[in-house]
């Protein structure tokens, strides 16, 4: 399971160091794609396959389903770690998430999320202010 928060910088070649604690869980090859809230999602191959199978069950007759899967899969790219534990993030994904230099990499159960530091700070501060309300809304999920 992925958990924790780490800060790393993207170098001038678009490479990002993946935290050592995440490398073994991600494996040698994994998938990175557009996430929600203007971040990137990275999945180990096994988790990606599970998600892919679920998304394939969405009805093609539903416009929202087509739009979501189109957006999600068109941004997907297979990545692998280099010998220094870095990934080369494709330029379209760097642009989507406004990743320039300072990043925050967080573990979220079965995936990691990659955020620009400024965007993460905004999202974190907003969630921190409403954490009690968020928790209350989760009661129906038996958490």
Swiss-Prot record:
<dbReference type="InterPro" id="IPR037914">
    <property type="entry name" value="SpoVT-AbrB_sf"/>
</dbReference>
<dbReference type="InterPro" id="IPR035644">
    <property type="entry name" value="MraZ_C"/>
</dbReference>
<dbReference type="GO" id="GO:0005737">
    <property type="term" value="C:cytoplasm"/>
</dbReference>
<protein>
    <recommendedName>
        <fullName>Transcriptional regulator MraZ</fullName>
    </recommendedName>
</protein>
<dbReference type="GO" id="GO:2000143">
    <property type="term" value="P:negative regulation of DNA-templated transcription initiation"/>
</dbReference>
<keyword id="KW-0238">DNA-binding</keyword>
<feature type="domain" description="SpoVT-AbrB 2">
    <location>
        <begin position="76"/>
        <end position="119"/>
    </location>
</feature>
<dbReference type="GO" id="GO:0000976">
    <property type="term" value="F:transcription cis-regulatory region binding"/>
</dbReference>
<comment type="subunit">
    <text>Forms oligomers.</text>
</comment>
<dbReference type="InterPro" id="IPR020603">
    <property type="entry name" value="MraZ_dom"/>
</dbReference>
<dbReference type="InterPro" id="IPR007159">
    <property type="entry name" value="SpoVT-AbrB_dom"/>
</dbReference>
<dbReference type="GO" id="GO:0009295">
    <property type="term" value="C:nucleoid"/>
</dbReference>
<keyword id="KW-0677">Repeat</keyword>
<dbReference type="InterPro" id="IPR003444">
    <property type="entry name" value="MraZ"/>
</dbReference>
<feature type="domain" description="SpoVT-AbrB 1">
    <location>
        <begin position="5"/>
        <end position="47"/>
    </location>
</feature>
<dbReference type="Pfam" id="PF02381">
    <property type="entry name" value="MraZ"/>
</dbReference>
<keyword id="KW-0805">Transcription regulation</keyword>
<keyword id="KW-0963">Cytoplasm</keyword>
<dbReference type="InterPro" id="IPR035642">
    <property type="entry name" value="MraZ_N"/>
</dbReference>
<dbReference type="GO" id="GO:0003700">
    <property type="term" value="F:DNA-binding transcription factor activity"/>
</dbReference>
<comment type="similarity">
    <text>Belongs to the MraZ family.</text>
</comment>
<keyword id="KW-0804">Transcription</keyword>
<dbReference type="InterPro" id="IPR038619">
    <property type="entry name" value="MraZ_sf"/>
</dbReference>
């Amino acid at each position: 399971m992925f958990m924790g928060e780490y800060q790393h910088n993207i170098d001038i070649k678009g490479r990002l160091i993946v935290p050592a604690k995440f490398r073994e869980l991600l494996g040698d090859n994994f998938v990175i794609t557009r996430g929600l809230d203007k971040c990137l999602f990275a999945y180990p191959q096994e988790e990606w396959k599970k998600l892919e199978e679920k998304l394939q069950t969405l009805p093609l007759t539903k416009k929202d389903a087509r739009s979501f899967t189109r957006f999600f899969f068109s941004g997907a790219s297979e990545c692998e770690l280099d010998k220094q534990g870095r990934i080369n993030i494709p330029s379209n994904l760097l642009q989507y998430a406004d990743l320039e230099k300072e990043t925050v990499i967080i573990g979220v159960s079965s995936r990691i999320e990659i955020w620009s530091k400024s965007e993460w700070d905004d999202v974190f501060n907003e969630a921190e202010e409403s954490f009690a309300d968020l928790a209350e809304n989760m009661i129906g999920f038996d958490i």
